[in-house]
Amino acid sequence: MKSLILLTALSMPLFAASGALKTKATELSKAHQDSTLFISAVVTIELTAGSNPTQKEEKKVEVLGTVLNAEGLIVAPLSTIDLASSMDGRTVNTPQGPIKISAKSDVKEVKILMPDGTETDAKIALKDTDLDLVFLKPEKPASNFKPVPLADTAPMNLLDDIIVIGRMSKELNREPMAATGEIISVIKKPRLFGKISAPATGMPVFNDQGKFLGIGINRLTSKSSGENNVASTSVLLPAADIADSASQVK
C-alpha cells in the first residue's frame, strides 16, 4: 500500500506557492509544526485464507498522526497502523473458488515520537473503521501537546488553495514540512471527501485563510466489491467528521 500511495503522490502535479498563500503556509508551519507527530508501534498480523493455515507476521511501523487536543489525543488513518483492517472480511476469487479472508492485528508498544526526540507511551483509544480513523492518547495524563484548531473550520470547495502541514520520514530526521496545493475534486457520495493535489496521509490540511479542513486518510475499495486487490486512494476527510468521531473517545 505504501508504494501505491507514494506512486500516487509522485504523479500529482506540482504546485508552487507564492504571495499570500506562501506567507500563510509559512505562518501555519511555524504555528502547527508540532501538531503532526509520528506514532510508532509493533504490529502482529494473523491472516487466514479459507481453510489454509494461519500466517503470522510481525513488523514495526511509523505513521503520521494529527494532534487534536492539549492532552495528546491524536488521530491517524486506521489502515496505516491496523494493517489487517483493510483485509479482514474480504472475499478473493481463486481457481478453487471464492475464499474469504480473515485477518486481525495486535498493535502493541505504541509510542508517540515527540518533537524533542523523546518517546511517550500511548494506547489506542478508539477505532472508526468506516472513516479509516484510529484515535490514540498517552498512557499517562499530559497537557503539553500542540493541537490543530479543531473548531476553527471551513467547508471544502473545488479549486480552493490548501496547505498541508506534516513531517518528513525517519530517513530525513522527521523534520517539519509544509506543502501547498488545491482541491481538485469534491466527492459527495457515499459521503463527503475532498481530493487534493498534495500528499497528506495522516496530516492536517488548511485552507488559505488558515481554517482547518481535515486530514488525509485512505479510501479503500469496498469489501463487497469482489475485487482481489485492495485498492487505496488518499482523500481529505472533513474536520466535522473527525470531530464527531473524536467525541466518542472516553
Regions found by a protein language model. Name each.
Residues 24, 145-200, 216-228:
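Flexible, gly/ser-rich surface segments that form the specificity/activation loops bordering the active-site cleft
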Residues 62, 69, 76-84, 166, ...:
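Short beta->alpha transition motifs characteristic of CBS
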Residues 206-250:
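C-terminal subregion of chymotrypsin/trypsin-like serine protease catalytic domains
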Residues 17-77, 109, 240-250:
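N-terminal activation segment of mature serine protease catalytic domains
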